[in-house]
Amino acid sequence: MLVFLHAVFITVLILLLIGRLQLLERLLLNHSLNLKTVNNVLGVTHTGLKVNCLQLLKPDCLDFNILHRSLAETRLLKVVLRVIFLVLLGFCCYRLLVTLF
């Protein structure tokens, strides 16, 4: 019974982690969209003052590859956690059936 409770506890923790990773993924996508928007606006010629203000928003070391790589790593981690969740859920169901019968 103690093993079953530990498995349920770990399963709940994995579900919470998956929720946090989904939030992180949304934030990364939103940040990527904002950076692309700033980059597109900077490419258009405007008055000097407006471009200077927008250049303050754009860092010099802007690298979209790093952002996309972190987004891919977040998605991969989410898939791995879902697989672990399904294995633990199967184990919990198995232990419950063994206990009942």
Curated annotation (Swiss-Prot):
It is a single-pass membrane protein. Residues 1-23 form the signal peptide. The keyword Transmembrane applies. It is found in: Host membrane. Pfam families: Corona_7 (PF02398). Its main location: host cell. InterPro entries: Corona_7. The chain crosses the membrane at residues 81-101. GO terms for cellular component: host cell membrane; membrane. Keywords: Host membrane, Membrane, Signal, Transmembrane, Transmembrane helix. Belongs to the coronaviruses ns7/ns7a protein family. May function in the formation of membrane-bound replication complexes or in the assembly of the virus. This is Non-structural protein 7a. It comes from Canine coronavirus (strain Insavc-1) (CCoV).
